[in-house]
Amino acid sequence: MVEVSVSILNVKDDKAIQTLYNLETSGINYFHIDVMDGKFVKNDTTNKMLEFSEYLNQISNLPLDVHLMVEDVESYIKSFAIFDPNIITFHLEAGKSREEILKWIKLLNENNIRVGISIKPNTKVEEVYEYLPFVHLVLVMTVEPGEGGQKLLPDTIEKIKELKKYIDENNFEVDIEADGGINTENANIVREAGADMLVSGSAIINAEDYKEIIIKLKG
């Protein structure tokens, strides 16, 4: 069964405490922390996500799954490492060189944080292959990063299939996380393509019954 990481990007501030408490007991596996710097993507969620991460550390037993959509990856790793997340994922596209990307991987390893690397919809999946021996997870964006509530891009399903095939053929122990536009209508397609983790935000947050939606997402 796949795992579900709930994006709290669109949790309303005035309902945050109750919403996060209800999510905690709904059957999710992770809280997905969407960190945006206003540069790598147009929105800036840094302060909101720092606050949510600190709050979740105090009230939740669930692991944090931090997704950095930022240019200055190193400083953001340091900012969010203090919350002891299970995973921090950075974008391949943010790296200016192989050496820089390997430096970020080393920094995460030194902090005992699982390493995730993400690719945008227009990035070829082959570009991530050389890093598979060094990471725990590849996050495939199934929408353009930067905003919640978008529709899943169908072409990204093939990318997940290709990645899954390559991982299996080379016996890598790497999970695939799919993020963007995932709901109960398309989750089965994403699961069948080979995703191990589904990120879902709006589909869960806007539902009346979180538990029911999460059961359907997990299949």
Predicted feature residues:
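Histidine/lysine/aspartate-rich catalytic loop segments that bind and position anionic ligands
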Residues: 118-156
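Glycine-rich, proline-tolerant flexible connector loops at the mouths of alpha/beta enzymes
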Residues: 31-50, 92-95, 143-149
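Hydrophobic faces of well-ordered beta-strands that scaffold small-molecule active sites
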Residues: 2-7, 31-33, 64-68, 88-90, ...
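Glycine-rich phosphate-binding active-site loops on the catalytic face of alpha/beta enzymes
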Residues: 88-96, 139-150, 193-214
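Glycine/small-residue-rich loop that forms an oxyanion/phosphate-binding "nest" at active or ligand-binding sites
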Residues: 45-102, 117
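Catalytic cores of alpha/beta
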Residues: 16-23, 72-82, 123-135, 181-198
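Active-site beta-loop-alpha junctions enriched in small/polar residues
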Residues: 7-11, 36-38, 69-73, 93-95, ...
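Alpha-helix-loop-beta-strand connector modules within alpha/beta enzyme cores
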Residues: 46-66, 107-116, 156-176, 180, ...
